[in-house]
Amino acid sequence: GYVEHRPLPSHSFDAGAAWANLALQTTQAGWHAHAMAGFDRDLLRTRLGVPADYAIEAVVAIGRIGDKSLLPEALAQREIPSQRLPLEELVAEGKFAFGT
């Protein structure tokens, strides 16, 4: 039958929860999941035929971690942990206090 499409303001939260569970399950199974946000959404939408009314949040690669010594030098140099913000910049108590 007909299903009415309506905006779902919690879709990003739901996508994050789905990603977290996917990452946990792949780790449990001995695999590795790597989420990526830096990709060409328009190209992906075209190649996979994703309708315009669907949001593409991220892509995920699932596989086994390989031997880093086999990477080309340019890629090997990128294999370092990224900087993380201190918790004080991410967590607040009480009223919203960021950017004010």
Feature-to-residue mapping (PLM):
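Acidic, surface-exposed loops and disordered segments
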Residues: 1-100
